[in-house]
């Protein structure tokens, strides 16, 4: 890394945007949500969440990233993260190292690049999830985030399997929204659904059934308090976890017997936000009868891995 470069690592997912300054070793995490009123940006991350329950007719709540693709402008999010890192201070403009989905199209790369250039970034380098996570030894990688899951199997200096499926955290959240509506008649936001998922998962890890609370809208957009047991959320987690485990099993079954034996002994690596969630690791292990090695900071795996790509 050149001495005159100010490098920032970014992992901008559909749920969280993570920023890391290589020189100061400071890390910033924002929620990937923006509140707008017309063309005016009202808030980003937690500031945007404050608008979830007010002025619904005039304020737009945007979730700008899905499946690694830009749906709405991400420039306010980039500016906020870089500002919090003081990346614009001094004479040097920041350069960014950005993790992206392994199957991201060239058109989407161009959109990402233009967004960073519009934010005053000097240099942009992209690195795929597979490039970040791949190891020298044979590895069976399942990276399951908020909007997609990547499955990669690498051995003999080759990528033998590379598959992206659209079963991940957001699909769990959508099922939770549906379940809550069926049980209560109230609609809950994506943010509340994600919160219920996390709270229910924590309870399941502890083998408990707890009472979960949030707010929901009726048909007239009036807010009401909601209480449901965590067990009601389990079918949503189970459905998506089952799909992930079935695809992992399908990829496993394509391997030669020698590699199957290797992974039965050494295990499958599960990373991303869904590694934190109770369900995927249990069902994968049950389906293939092999150990599943979950990372310790699932939602921060990619930014943690990026820290080793460049040294300050």
Language model: regions and residue ranges:
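Nucleotide/phosphate-binding catalytic cleft detector across ATP-hydrolyzing
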Residues: 1-42, 46-144, 154-268, 275-301, ...
């Amino acid at each position: 890394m050149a001495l005159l470069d100010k490098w920032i690592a970014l992992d901008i997912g559909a749920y969280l945007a993570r920023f890391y300054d290589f020189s100061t070793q400071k890390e910033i995490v924002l929620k990937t949500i923006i509140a707008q009123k017309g063309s005016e940006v009202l808030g980003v991350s937690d500031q945007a969440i404050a608008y979830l329950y007010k002025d619904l007719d005039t304020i737009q709540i945007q979730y700008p990233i899905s499946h690694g693709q830009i749906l709405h402008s991400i420039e306010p999010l980039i500016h906020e993260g870089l500002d919090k890192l003081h990346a614009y201070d001094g004479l040097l403009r920041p350069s960014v190292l950005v993790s992206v989905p392994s199957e991201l199209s060239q058109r989407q790369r161009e959109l990402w690049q233009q967004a960073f250039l519009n934010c005053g970034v000097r240099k942009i380098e992209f690195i795929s999830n597979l490039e970040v996570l791949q190891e020298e030894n044979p590895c069976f990688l399942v990276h399951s985030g908020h909007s997609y899951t990547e499955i990669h199997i690498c051995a003999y200096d080759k990528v033998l399997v590379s598959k992206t499926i659209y079963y991940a955290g957001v699909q769990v959240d959508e099922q939770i929204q549906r379940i809550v509506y069926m049980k209560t008649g109230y609609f809950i936001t994506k943010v509340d659904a994600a919160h219920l998922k996390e709270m229910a998962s924590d309870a399941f890890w502890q083998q408990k059934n707890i009472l979960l609370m949030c707010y929901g809208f009726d048909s007239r957009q009036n807010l009401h308090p909601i209480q449901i047991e965590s067990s009601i959320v389990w079918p949503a987690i189970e459905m998506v976890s089952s799909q992930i485990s079935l695809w992992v099993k399908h990829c496993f079954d394509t391997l030669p017997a020698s590699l199957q034996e290797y992974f039965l002994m050494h295990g499958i690596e599960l990373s991303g936000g869904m590694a934190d969630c109770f369900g995927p690791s249990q069902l994968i292990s049950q389906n293939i009868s092999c150990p599943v090695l979950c990372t310790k900071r699932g939602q921060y795996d990619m930014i943690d891995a990026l820290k080793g790509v460049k040294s300050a």
